[in-house]
């Protein structure tokens, strides 16, 4: 290098004037070019360090940083916004300058030219940190490494400065930025200092918050301090007020403040940095101090950073000294020196000043001064980019879940299946398709399968729709693969302990999903039979992944891949690639396959893929194809370093994953050994692994001749070559899971991976069961010599000491793709051994339904019974910090496992458990912090928190350092309890309490508690004001400390006392005034704590006299342990001085409301908060009770508000509970209790109240000591959502190629043989009978003479209308038939027909020769002794069944003995009422009606045929009646119980409603929508005599509805009962509209054909309540009420009339306002209609639509919102926007809107 050359590199404290985003973008682009290798390394290291530093931030700060993959991701964040502004600005400036520096050298491709002695470094403020990295470097590669550490220090410095500064003055609550520094020009440093000194003196400014000089030169002075004080200083000083000054862009706090920072502050920033550079690296280049202008004297990196830290925090900047130092360096040492250079990053005022000074120095000399801009290179074009390769991390699989054949619904069951060597082969179950019609071994029948075999998962339709916010309708239409993908994804995440957002790697924006799927059976077959709203989102593949991302709110990528049979493992490989590429930080991957479509069976069979003989016979000589299988599997994958940092359980490590294609195969479906071997080599090379070291391979192994031969060749050649040969101890074991569970196609690869992971877990290779006869001769003969072979028995696979086992998983696609995964053992985890001193632990469980919560509790109890040695700490960690939490919650704090077991058993044994559990509210309750006064003080308060939690400890220490800098004693010994247990001074007592409370408030914020308001009691009000941002923490400490000093100086300790009295203030006054000896005693009211608790103060003698007097009246009194009588005249001597001190303190508007005990109001602005307020608060009464009442009156406090007592002991919590008995009040600390236990209990209480604490922060200090337990998985509240494939249409479509056959009208054949035929049930169309379940489908024609005659026996408006007795007979007929099928030897079958609900009346058509079919579907479950029934209309031409039922009911098979006992107790009461009616009739007080008169009255609504007229006489008294009944002797057909007999004994209720004077029968008629039950103790007898009795009454929940019980007596005995039969009032003007014959017999909408139905009834009783699938009403052919009328009038009862829920007909009469008035509108009827419509469309029960139910939870998404808004318009005449479901997110808000606007 030229000896005449000198250089200065200057690092500025300002960003270049260029567009910052563009600068960083250009840096990022260049870093991707291999020519900028060191720049890339520096940016990568800086990114890693920033991620590490962000991960260590307290949660509230951590959440401010968006997820970022590189520093470029942070550029869009406004540096200056929020509490991390200083940290972000400092670190980004350091990154930018060092990146530009490194890039400059790499762009020039020049050697390092900074030579000690010839080059010097200089900088200002943060720029010095960047310069330090260069000073520590001997080459450019050193800068990249040291620079990243400089970034760490700059970030930490910014965080620390902002934190300390916020304690001096809180940021503006409205986010307005205020400058902490102003520059003054044309004034000397001395004159400015004089003005500042005068201001600080005059305003009594505390030392810490004084205004000071932070920088100076000959032309300007920088003034720094809290923004409000700078403003006050410039207003106070006339000189400064009129000076030339400007605010500097310094928005985040104070540096260069020697009065503020100490060496301990510097050490906490520098010495705590995890640096591998700082300890031993030497300083290579001189770096000038910005204070002295001389080089720092440090010799090592650690010394240099400490010096720089000291200068940045405490040193004043003197620009003149910097300039002088630079000039000195450039000063010529000899005449030969001629070339000087200044390198910089653009220019600035400071740099121009330096440049001018140097030029002035060399003026007249022959010296050359040049400037080099280190920014210019970044904008150059370097030609085409030369990409760099991405480094690969190892990946960790941390969670897995499955649904696999053979009942393997979890991993334990899957392993048991493998370990036992079980084969899950079975025939196709009838719930998939009917083998009787779709299986033809000859293959002659078109579209049939030639094999009946497969491997199937259990209960594929079972799903917890409510958990995943899906409506039953959406769930039913959604592909079971997609549903189970959701389920297994959740279970895998649960196993992995993933809580989205808990760590940087699990931020929702960094999680992606990758699933393999190769078929669409459900969409193409099952759901396509009746295409609905959810056909696309429920069936299209992309929605499978999309639904996972949407439910969990993951915004990473979602990919659905199809690579045929390798789809599952290819999805895993894609996930690995995304992790290696940095696209995601966590990936969920898996494979999906659920078989339902016989077409795929046929296609695969015809292509000779499938075995006709059974299971996959892997490597067997008779291998003849594969056997199909279901399968669902999910795994969770992270980068290994992230998994270790997150304290995850690592199942195995992925070293490599590759996919290629068999392009050279002889056909597209034929495997190719060369391609497979090439893929193995690629994955081995990717990981740098010797193939000989692999000891287990999970084969693709399908059991095909070609596949087995090729794979055995490729595997043996690569992993067990002839040479080098494997040693005897290097046995290579092979396995193939398809021999157990078949070929899961898209799920095959994930099943193989799951098996391999279990092999790692269990250290055992399960036996191979694929060879049924002998090994396939196509397999290489020398495998044994190569030391490779199948594990034919369960073979131990131990982990070698100090080594890791390697395994390979293969999965090949039929299209030619080959995917291979290379695994190794997880790192051996060394659990940190700590001293577990937490006394209690919080154990939590949650669910989204009561049943699931109860089941989760049962599972945990069972687990603990099985593993009683479980670590309670690990259990608490797992159930709280590592679980996603839901709205049904259980939580407890316990000290031992046995205590937890006791609590669980107690809860589970509670018979009222289900009713007592309530979901937490959707809206998070507000939380108010209540700060106690000094009366709660004791030594050691918060000691355990201080010792355990670094964040809490740091807060206390920072506040304590501030107190010490203000001249007060340290409070740390009080908290540590290292002080002598003697009375403390008021200063120490009061400062300790306030510092503790401020630190506790911040700790609660760290734990995730969002504060809504604060209240302080006495001294606690200072902490409250500080937390609310009214005053800074420093000012709070200063005022409290000085206040305490004034009290010590001016007030006599022990002369006064305070007395707590259990009585209100006025009562105390009256009691004292009533006695002469106490009437004149002087005292003052210090505190009104509650309406019954008062604290008074005064002189000791007088207070003692009062105490004795009040105790004599049995009033509880307590002398408080305080040295002064606060809030009394004793405080008068300090008030003036306290107010003067407070006037120097800036007061700001509160960031959260302040509840004021002084003013008894809630304060929202700064007007009332000032020095006078603190004066009055010191002297006047603390009216805590009035303040609470005011907060209630102003709506800030309600019954759900949560209170947290912030202080040493929960005094305020007790006061709040006294004022609000229902209040939830928690503690922060408690005297004589471990403070961690107190916090733990309070966190549980908050959790149960609906707050979501940040449990991760609670466990963070010791997370390495805890283990994530593998607990039982979530217990789902499942219901079977299954659409069976109905009919044979996959077969029938084959005939289309021969031409469409002519269609013929549908008819119900009465000549076709049927095992069940009656007058109403005509033909069985489908029947399945199993061990405990049975299913029956029947079809009937309402136009059949027997059926039609039964209908015409009950006419309304001259139309035959099916009466409820018809549905009763059909139900009893089918019920007895099916019951006897399961229990054939039953003598008598006693049935209780319950829950009868008819949504649409059935009116007989008057078209002669027409067909009017209806379908009855029944499902019987013997385990619950119940049967569900649903009636459907069917198309009169095609026979197609409607998708939705018009009626439903249940039958319960019961013991008649219980009925007899029940009715025997009631019989005398019923007989008594009958006798009363007879007596009243004889007295003329009740009406006795003859048969003709009774039925004449009935004819007002219903005209009964003669056979239905069984009532001989009736006694009617308003709504009560009895009848004498004689049944006609003729049955008139084939029935179980003739409808005309049923009607005769029960229709007395209808006569009461439609014939009594108590009803307005002129304007209204009454129809019945159903009943709760119908029972007959014995069969009705022909010609027998009965009596009926009923008393109807209005139902309180609906003014248009009446109900009552009809009793049927034979002799003196009750022999039957219709329980709670209901009648609805309907305007008579609607008679024509509701009861007119249908004009068509067709059913709208495509529906599945009826013929050939085969359905398996699933027993769901053990997992969920028996509940028929809810089906909405369909549009019937008969006319219905218009939409206008539907919205104005009560809807008619649907049993006998069409419900207003039906669609509006095309032509509807206009309803005039007068008609609307006559309809007697009822406000809540519109609400009822709306709710029923929503229930119908979503498939939910109306009962589920509670006021607090949210539409999101009910599964109402944007698509359903559109559907509902359209239905509201067309059916109810209500115009709403679909967005209303977002604007009114709950049912209650929606109904309120409807009431208001509709």
Curated annotation (Swiss-Prot):
Q: Which residues carry this modification: O-(pantetheine 4'-phosphoryl)serine?
A: 1758
Query: Part of which pathway?
Result: Secondary metabolite biosynthesis
Q: Where is the Ketosynthase family 3 (KS3) domain?
A: 392-825
For this protein, the record's Pfam families field holds: Acyl_transf_1, CurL-like_PKS_C, ketoacyl-synt, Ketoacyl-synt_C, PP-binding, SAT
- Which co-factors does it depend on? pantetheine 4'-phosphate
Signal sequence residues: none
Task: Give positions of region: N-terminal hotdog fold.
Answer: 1322-1458
Q: Where is this region: C-terminal hotdog fold?
A: 1486-1632
InterPro entries in UniProt: Ac_transferase_dom_sf (IPR001227), ACP-like_sf (IPR036736), Acyl_transferase_dom (IPR014043), Acyl_Trfase/lysoPLipase (IPR016035), Ketoacyl_synth_AS (IPR018201), Ketoacyl_synth_C (IPR014031), Ketoacyl_synth_N (IPR014030), PKS_Beta-ketoAc_synthase_dom (IPR020841)
The reply on keyword Nucleotidyltransferase is no
- Domain named PKS/mFAS DH: residues: 1322-1632
Mark out the compositionally biased spans (Low complexity). 1698-1709
Question: Which SMART domains does the record cross-reference, listed alphabetically?
Answer: PKS_AT, PKS_KS, PKS_PP
Q: Which GO terms describe its biological process?
A: fatty acid biosynthetic process; secondary metabolite biosynthetic process
Active site, per annotation: 565, 700, 743, 1354, 1543
Is this entry keyworded Transferase? Answer: yes
Q: Where is the composition biased (Polar residues)?
A: 444-453
Q: Show the segment(s) annotated as Product template (PT) domain.
A: 1390-1628
Q: Where is this region: Malonyl-CoA:ACP transacylase (MAT) domain?
A: 931-1230
Which keywords belong to this entry?
Acyltransferase, Multifunctional enzyme, Phosphopantetheine, Phosphoprotein, Transferase
Q: Where is the Carrier domain?
A: 1721-1798
**Protein name stated in the entry:** Non-reducing polyketide synthase nscA
Q: Which organism is it from?
A: Arthroderma benhamiae (strain ATCC MYA-4681 / CBS 112371)
Which gene produces this protein?
nscA
């Amino acid at each position: 290098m030229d000896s005449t050359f000198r250089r200065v590199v200057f690092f500025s404290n300002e960003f270049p004037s260029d567009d910052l985003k563009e600068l960083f973008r250009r840096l990022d682009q260049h870093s991707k070019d291999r020519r900028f290798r060191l720049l890339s390394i520096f940016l990568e290291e800086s990114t890693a360090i920033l991620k590490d530093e962000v991960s260590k931030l307290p949660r509230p700060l951590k959440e401010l940083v968006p997820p970022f993959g590189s520093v470029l991701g942070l550029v869009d964040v406004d540096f200056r916004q929020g509490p991390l502004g200083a940290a972000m600005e400092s670190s980004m400036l350091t990154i930018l300058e060092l990146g530009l520096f490194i890039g400059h050298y790499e762009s020039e491709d020049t050697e390092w030219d900074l030579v000690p002695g010839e080059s010097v470094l200089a900088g200002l403020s943060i720029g010095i940190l960047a310069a330090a990295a260069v000073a520590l470097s001997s080459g450019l590669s050193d800068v990249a490494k040291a620079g990243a550490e400089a970034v760490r220090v700059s970030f930490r410095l910014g965080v620390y400065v902002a934190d300390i500064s916020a304690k001096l003055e809180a940021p503006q609550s409205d986010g307005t930025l205020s400058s902490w520094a102003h520059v003054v020009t044309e004034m000397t440093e001395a004159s400015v200092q004089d003005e500042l000194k005068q201001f600080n003196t005059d305003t009594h400014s505390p030392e810490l918050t004084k205004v000071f000089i932070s920088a100076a030169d000959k032309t300007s002075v920088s003034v720094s301090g809290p923004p409000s004080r700078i403003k006050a200083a410039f207003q106070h000083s006339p000189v400064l007020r009129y000076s030339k000054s400007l605010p500097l862009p310094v928005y985040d706090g104070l540096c260069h403040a020697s009065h503020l920072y100490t060496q301990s502050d510097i050490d906490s920033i520098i010495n705590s940095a995890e640096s591998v550079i700082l300890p031993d690296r030497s300083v290579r280049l001189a770096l000038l101090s910005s204070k002295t202008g001389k080089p720092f004297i440090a010799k090592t990196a650690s010394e240099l950073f400490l010096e720089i830290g000291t200068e940045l925090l405490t040193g004043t900047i003197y620009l003149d000294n910097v300039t002088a130092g630079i000039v000195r360096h450039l000063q010529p040492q000899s005449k030969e020196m001629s070339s000087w250079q200044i390198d910089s990053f653009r220019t600035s005022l400071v740099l121009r000043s330096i440049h001018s000074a140097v030029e002035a120095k060399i003026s007249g000399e022959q010296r050359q001064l040049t400037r080099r801009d280190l920014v210019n290179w970044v904008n150059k074009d370097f030609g085409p980019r030369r990409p760099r390769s991405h480094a690969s991390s190892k990946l960790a699989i941390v969670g897995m879940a499955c649904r696999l054949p053979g009942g393997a619904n979890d991993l334990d069951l899957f392993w048991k299946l493998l370990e036992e060597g079980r084969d899950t082969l079975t025939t196709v179950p009838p719930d998939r398709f009917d083998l009787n019609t779709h299986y033809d071994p000859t293959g002659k029948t078109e579209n049939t399968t030639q094999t009946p075999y497969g491997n199937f998962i259990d209960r594929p339709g079972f799903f917890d729709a409510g958990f995943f916010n899906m409506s039953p309708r959406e769930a039913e239409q959604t592909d079971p693969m997609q549903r189970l993908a959701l389920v297994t994804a959740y279970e895998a995440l649960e196993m992995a302990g993933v809580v989205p957002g808990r760590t940087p790697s699990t931020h929702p924006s960094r999680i992606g999903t990758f699933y393999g799927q190769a078929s669409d059976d459900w969409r193409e077959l099952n759901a396509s039979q009746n295409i609905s709203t959810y056909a696309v989102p429920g069936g299209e593949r992309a929605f499978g992944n999309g639904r996972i991302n949407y439910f969990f709110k993951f915004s990473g990528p979602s990919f659905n891949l199809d690579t045929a049979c390798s789809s599952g493992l290819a999805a895993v490989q894609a996930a690995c690639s995304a992790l290696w590429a940095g696209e995601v930080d966590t990936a969920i991957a898996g494979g999906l396959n659920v078989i339902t479509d016989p077409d795929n069976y046929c296609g695969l069979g015809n292509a000779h893929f499938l075995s006709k003989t059974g299971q996959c016979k892997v490597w067997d000589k008779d291998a003849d194809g594969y056997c199909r299988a279901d399968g669902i599997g999910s795994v969770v994958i992270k980068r290994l370093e992230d998994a270790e940092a997150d304290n995850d359980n690592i199942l195995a490590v992925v070293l490599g994953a590759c996919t290629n294609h068999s392009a050279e195969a002889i056909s597209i479906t034929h495997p190719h050994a060369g391609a497979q071997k090439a893929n193995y080599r690629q994955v081995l090379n990717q990981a740098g692994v010797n193939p000989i070291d692999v000891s287990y391979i999970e084969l693709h192994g399908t059991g095909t001749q070609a596949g087995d031969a090729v794979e055995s060749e490729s595997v043996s050649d690569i992993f067990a070559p002839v040479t080098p040969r494997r040693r005897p101890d290097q046995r290579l074991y092979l396995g193939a899971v398809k021999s157990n569970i078949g070929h899961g196609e898209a799920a095959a690869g994930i099943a193989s991976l799951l098996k391999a992971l279990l092999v790692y877990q269990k250290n055992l290779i399960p036996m191979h069961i694929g060879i049924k006869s002998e090994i396939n001769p196509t397999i290489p003969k020398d495998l044994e010599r190569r030391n490779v072979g199948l594990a034919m028995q369960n073979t131990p696979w131990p982990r070698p000491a100090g080594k890791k086992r390697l395994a390979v998983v293969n999965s090949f696609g039929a299209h030619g793709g080959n995917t291979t995964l290379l695994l190794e053992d997880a790192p051996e985890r060394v659990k940190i051994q700590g001293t577990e001193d937490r006394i209690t632990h919080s154990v939590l469980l949650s669910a989204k339904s009561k049943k699931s919560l109860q089941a989760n509790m049962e599972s945990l109890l069972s687990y603990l019974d099985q593993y009683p040695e479980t670590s309670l700490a690990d259990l608490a960690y797992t159930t709280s910090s590592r679980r996603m939490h839901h709205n049904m919650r259980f939580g407890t704090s316990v000290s031992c496992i046995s205590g937890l077991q006791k609590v669980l058993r107690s809860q589970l044994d509670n018979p009222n458990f289900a009713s007592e559990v309530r979901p937490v509210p959707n809206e998070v309750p507000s939380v108010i912090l209540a700060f106690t006064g000094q009366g709660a003080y004791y030594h050691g308060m918060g000691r355990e928190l201080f010792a355990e939690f670094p964040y809490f400890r740091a807060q206390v220490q920072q506040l304590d350092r501030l107190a010490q800098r203000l001249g007060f004693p340290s409070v740390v010994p009080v908290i540590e309890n290292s002080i002598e247990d003697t009375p403390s001074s008021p200063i120490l007592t009061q400062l300790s309490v306030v510092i503790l409370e401020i630190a506790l408030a911040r700790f609660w914020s760290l734990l995730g508690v969002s504060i809504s308001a604060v209240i302080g009691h006495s001294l606690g009000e200072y902490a409250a004001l500080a937390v609310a941002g009214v005053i800074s923490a420093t000012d709070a400490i200063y005022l409290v400390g000085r206040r305490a000093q004034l009290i010590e100086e001016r007030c006599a300790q022990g002369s006064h006392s305070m007395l707590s009295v259990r009585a209100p203030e006025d009562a105390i006054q009256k009691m004292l005034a009533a006695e002469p000896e106490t009437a004149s005693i002087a005292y003052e009211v210090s505190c009104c704590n509650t309406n019954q608790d008062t604290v008074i103060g005064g002189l000791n003698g007088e207070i003692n006299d009062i105490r004795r007097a009040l105790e004599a009246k049995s009033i509880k009194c307590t002398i408080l342990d305080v040295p002064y009588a606060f809030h009394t005249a004793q405080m008068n001597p300090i008030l003036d001085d306290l107010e003067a001190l407070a006037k120097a303190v800036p007061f700001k508007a509160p960031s959260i409301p302040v509840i004021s005990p002084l003013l008894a109001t809630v304060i929202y602005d700064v007007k009332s908060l000032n020095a006078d307020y603190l004066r009055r608060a010191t002297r006047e009464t603390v009216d805590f009770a009035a303040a609470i009442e005011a907060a209630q009156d102003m709506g800030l406090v309600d019954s759900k508000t949560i209170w947290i007592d912030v202080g040493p002991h929960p005094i305020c919590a007790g006061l709040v509970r006294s004022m609000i008995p229902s209040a939830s009040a928690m503690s922060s600390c408690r005297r004589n209790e471990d403070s961690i236990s107190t916090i733990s209990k309070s966190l549980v209480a908050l959790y149960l109240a609906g707050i979501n604490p940040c449990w991760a922060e609670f466990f963070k200090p010791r997370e390495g000591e805890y283990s994530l337990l593998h607990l039982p998985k979530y217990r789902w509240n499942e219901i079977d959502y299954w659409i069976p494939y109905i009919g044979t249409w996959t077969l029938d479509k084959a005939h289309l190629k021969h031409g469409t056959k002519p269609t013929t009208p549908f008819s119900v054949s009465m000549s076709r043989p049927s095992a069940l035929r009656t007058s109403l049930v005509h033909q069985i169309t489908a029947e399945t009978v199993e061990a405990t379940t049975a299913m029956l489908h029947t079809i009937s024609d309402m136009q059949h003479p027997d059926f039609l005659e039964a209908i015409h026996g009950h006419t309304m408006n001259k139309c035959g209308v099916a009466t409820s007795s018809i549905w009763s007979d059909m139900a009893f007929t089918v019920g007895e038939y099916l019951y006897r099928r399961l229990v054939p030897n039953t003598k008598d079958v006693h049935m209780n027909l319950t829950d009868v609900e008819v949504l649409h009346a059935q009116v007989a058509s008057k078209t002669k020769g027409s067909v009017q079919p209806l379908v009855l579907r029944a499902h019987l479950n013997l385990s619950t002794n119940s049967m569900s029934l649903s009636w459907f209309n069917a198309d009169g031409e095609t026979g197609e069944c409607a998708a939705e039922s018009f009626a439903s009911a249940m039958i319960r098979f019961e013991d008649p003995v219980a009925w007899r006992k029940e009715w025997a107790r009631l019989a005398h009461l019923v007989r008594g009422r009958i006798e009363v009616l007879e007596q009243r009739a004889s007295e003329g007080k009740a009406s006795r009606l003859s048969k003709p008169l009774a039925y004449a009255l009935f004819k007002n609504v219903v005209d009964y045929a003669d056979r239905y007229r069984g009532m001989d006489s009736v006694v009617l008294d308003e709504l009560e009646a009895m009848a004498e009944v004689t049944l006609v002797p003729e049955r008139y057909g084939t029935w179980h119980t003739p409808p005309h007999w049923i009607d005769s004994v029960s229709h007395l209720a209808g006569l009461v409603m439609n014939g009594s004077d108590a009803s307005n029968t002129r304007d209204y008629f009454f129809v019945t929508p159903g009943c709760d039950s119908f029972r007959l103790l014995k069969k009705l007898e022909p010609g027998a005599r009965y009596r009926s009795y009923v008393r109807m009454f209005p139902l309180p929940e609906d003014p248009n509805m009446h109900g009552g019980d009809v009793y049927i007596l034979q002799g003196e005995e009750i022999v039957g009962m219709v329980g709670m039969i209901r009648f609805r009032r309907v305007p008579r003007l609607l008679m024509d509209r509701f009861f007119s014959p249908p004009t068509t017999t067709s059913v709208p909408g495509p529906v599945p054909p009826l013929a050939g139905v085969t359905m398996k009834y699933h027993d769901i009783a053990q997992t969920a309540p028996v509940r028929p699938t809810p089906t909405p009403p369909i549009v019937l052919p008969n006319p219905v009420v218009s939409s206008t009328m539907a919205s104005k009038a009560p809807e008619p009862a649907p049993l006998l009339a069409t419900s207003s829920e039906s669609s509006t007909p095309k032509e509807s009469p206009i309803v005039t306002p007068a008609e609307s008035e006559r309809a007697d509108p009822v406000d809540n009827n519109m609400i009822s209609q709306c709710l029923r419509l929503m229930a119908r469309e979503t498939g939910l029960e109306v009962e589920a639509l509670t006021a607090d139910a949210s539409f999101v939870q009910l599964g109402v998404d944007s698509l359903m919102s559109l559907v509902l808004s359209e239905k509201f318009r067309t059916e109810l005449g209500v115009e709403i926007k679909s967005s209303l479901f977002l604007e009114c997110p709950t049912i209650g808000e929606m109904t309120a809107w409807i009431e208001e606007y509709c």
